[in-house]
Structure formats: structure tokens, C-alpha cells
């Protein structure tokens, strides 16, 4: 039965999640060199438009309409045909259109996360085409497998409350693959890349934290106790990760940094995303405290071993954070909190949820790697992915967009 309170709540949560993509633009934009800030923020802006058009035309239908082999949907809701004001099959107290809009914001933020790995060296048109194809090949199937009716990963007993697999692991792994393919930025081994605008970084992180309440609490799909539970676990995990990252910096560097604190709060949110509506409140303390050292030292190790240039650590934050979050859900999940989970977690004496979580993570990684390689192969048929050395040296703001984030005016502007 339709519920006005649930509908209002979900519309607000949808707007919250939308707010995350501009927040990501500020977060990433502040981290890059000033000659690439327009390009970095423009990538998020372009995805905001592209994702809405693709989702409403065919993305939603492929992710949530019908079922083919537990992997993909069909075209029954092409251009939202048959999607109206009445409740749909996935939420019985809100209009079907509201559910579509809420999920659309997930389809927006997810590919935007990838852009942090390739800043300063990928052609804008190549990135645009890559994101379009990636959404089709990776995101829509992942959304169906986890959340769609008859989805394969849901069938094996895996749970993902708000997008550990669908959003963070898929985008993080894809970001790493793309970064390895593109190669390092010019002078990467010699130069020290400075964060050009620290206030932007903190502003973006704060916008992300604000929007994440809609992201996680809204995944309850109604204004109830589960939404409140997800709200609190998200707050706690983020806060603990922030403080733990600061502590690591104090121990290793002698002083905390605002960039580090901002990074910590974001990875705390990443880690709690899959389990926000499944784990007890006390477990969110553990999840948040542990994700910071896990991500901090994994990033250092990976950069030493792989020599990869994941510029803004998209894999280190979202890939590793999402993997830990998925495993933690298998450790601490409880059916008494959310009956969508078929079994309790490993710490409560049942190994089945934990095994399902590990299997789903492995499958997600495989889908992301293979899908990203396919996307790269298709895009390179039409355009080189990497900019020319001269364009990279000048900066992508000027070479790709003809704009400067901080112009120097002579006379009146």
C-alpha cells in the first residue's frame, strides 16, 4: 500500500544521493593539479547527464526488468514504458518512479568514481565513451545480479545493502585496470604531486558524507527502523575511520592532515555500505576502525608492487574498502536485523553467509576486470585513450576544454 511518508523520505534520499556526484567532483577536483581541475570536475558533470539519459532509456530495464540467466534484465521498461505512480515490484509503499529515480543516482555516482584513477592523462571523449560502455557491460549486469529479481548473486545468498559489490568494488577494480592500461603520468616516478585545493577536498568529502545518509538509509526503501539503523552504522563507521586515519598519520608522519581525515571519512562510508542494514551497531565501530589501516597500507603496497598510477587511489579507497566491507558483512551480518540475509555471519557461528560474500566479491572482481578490458578494446577502435604528451604537459583543462579553473585577467574581466 502506498505510504506518503515513505514516498517523501525516498524522494529526499534520492536528492541526497544526487548530491554525492557534485561532492565527488569537488573531492577529486581538489586533489588534482590545478591544470587538470576543470577536466576532473567536468568528467563528473558529463556523467550526471549521460547516466540519466541511459538509465531512463534502457538502463533501469536492463538492471531491474525481467531476468535472463540471473545476469541481466530485458527491455520491458524501455524509456520507462509501464513505469508509473503505482508501487513497483521492488518497493510496495512508494511509486515505481521513485524507486527508478533512487536507483538512477547509484548509476550516476558509480562510474564517476572511476574517473579519479585516470586524471591528467585520458582523453575526455575516450572517457565519455568508456563510461557509456562500462555502464552497459558492467554496472547494469552487476545491479541485476545483486538487486534484480532472480539475480545470480542474490540467489547464492550474497547480500549487499547499498552497493559494496555493485558500486565500490566494481568501480574500484575497473579504475585500477584502466589506470594500468593508460600507464603512469609523465614524470610520475620523479615528481611529487601536490593537492592543489585542500578546502575543495574537505568540502567534497563533507558533501559525500551528507549524501551518503540518503545512499545507505534510503536503501531501506522506507522510513522505518532499518533506515535509522543504516543511518547510525554509517555515521559510526565513517567517524571511526576518520579518527583512525588521523591516528595513523600522527604515528607515521607526526601530524594529522585534512586530506587524510577527508579520505578516512570516505573510506569509512565505503566499508559500511554493503552491511549498513545487516550488521549490529557495535560492529560498525570495528568496520570503521579497521578499514583505515587496511586501505592505507594496501595502497602503499600496491603502488610498490604494481607500479600503477591510480592517481586518486580509486581502487585503494573504493575497491579495497568495498572488499573489506563485503567480508565484514559476512562476519557480522544478522538475520534478526534484516531478514534479506539468509544466514547469520561467521562470528555468530554460521559460515554460509561469509562464503557467499567471498564468492560474490570474487565474481564482482572478475566481471569488472573482463568488462573493463572489453570497454578498453571497444573505445580504442574509435579513439586513442591517452592524450598526447604535449596536451598532458599543458594540462587537460586547456587541451581538452579550453578553460582554466583559475584564469589570470589583465584589466577588467
Could you say what each language-model-derived stretch is?
Residues 1-413:
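Glycine- and aromatic-enriched membrane alpha-helices
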